[in-house]
Design a protein with these regions (language model features):
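C-terminal boundary and immediately downstream tail of ABC-type ATPase nucleotide-binding domains
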Residues: 174, 178-197
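ABC family nucleotide-binding domain
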Residues: 1-177
Length: 197
C-alpha cells in the first residue's frame, strides 16, 4: 500500500476503527453518530456519479434518499445489538458498554473489510466488558477480520487466529493462540503470561 500508484484512501474506506474512549460526538444523537460517515461518503459518490453520468438506476438520487437509507441501515445495526431504543438519545446518557457497542456499530455502518480495535474494553467498568467482548466474538464468528490490541487474554485465547505479543513497540512473539498460551518461547512473553493468567 506504500506504492504511489495505490490510492490509500480506497483502502481506508474499507477499514473501521474502534478506540478505547469511544470517540462518539457528544453533540449528535446515537443514530446521527452512526449515519454521519455513510451519508458523507455516499453524497460525495452521488455527486461524482452525477457529474460523470454513471449513476446506477437503483442508487439513491438525492441527499434525502441517502439519509433515509443510512438511517434504516443504522437502525438495523442498533436492533442487532439491542440498542434500537437508544437511537435518538445523546451519548452522555449511555453506559460505557453501550457507548462502545455504538462505536462498533458506527464502524460497521461503513461495511468495512477489517476493523481495528485499540483496547476496546480498557475504559469500561468490569461489568460492561462482557457485552462488548460478546459483540466482538459475534463479529469474529461471522468472519469479520479484526486486529485487536487487548489485555483480555481469555478473549484472545478464544477468538484469535494469531496472537502477537509486543513490548516497547517490538513484536517479541507471534503464534497461534494454542501455541502462544501453552508454549510461549520468549522469556518476556512467559513473564507476562505468568502475571496475567
Amino acid at each position: 500500500i506504500t506504492d504511489k500508484k495505490v490510492d490509500i484512501n480506497l483502502h481506508r474506506r474499507k477499514m473501521g476503527m474502534v478506540f478505547q474512549h469511544f470517540n462518539l460526538f457528544n453533540n449528535m444523537t446515537v443514530i446521527e453518530n452512526i449515519m454521519m460517515a455513510p451519508v458523507y461518503v455516499r453524497c460525495k459518490e452521488l455527486k461524482k456519479a452525477k457529474r460523470k453520468g454513471t449513476l446506477a438506476p437503483d442508487a439513491p438520487k438525492t441527499k434525502a434518499e441517502i439519509k433515509a437509507q443510512a438511517r434504516e441501515e443504522a437502525l438495523e445495526l442498533l436492533r442487532r445489538i439491542g440498542l434500537e431504543d437508544k437511537a435518538d438519545v445523546y451519548p452522555s446518557t449511555l453506559s460505557g458498554g453501550q457507548k462502545q457497542r455504538v462505536a462498533i456499530v458506527r464502524a460497521l455502518a461503513m461495511k468495512p473489510d477489517v476493523i481495528l480495535f485499540d483496547e476496546p474494553t480498557s475504559a469500561l467498568d468490569p461489568e460492561m466488558v462482557g457485552e462488548v467482548l460478546d459483540l466482538m466474538k459475534e463479529l469474529a464468528n461471522e468472519g469479520m477480520t479484526m486486529v485487536v490490541v487487548t489485555h483480555e487474554m481469555g478473549f484472545a485465547r478464544e477468538v484469535a487466529n494469531r496472537v502477537l505479543f509486543m513490548d516497547q513497540g517490538k513484536i517479541l512473539e507471534e503464534a497461534p493462540p494454542e501455541e502462544f498460551f501453552a508454549h510461549p518461547k520468549n522469556e518476556r512473553t512467559k513473564e507476562f503470561l505468568s502475571k496475567v493468567l
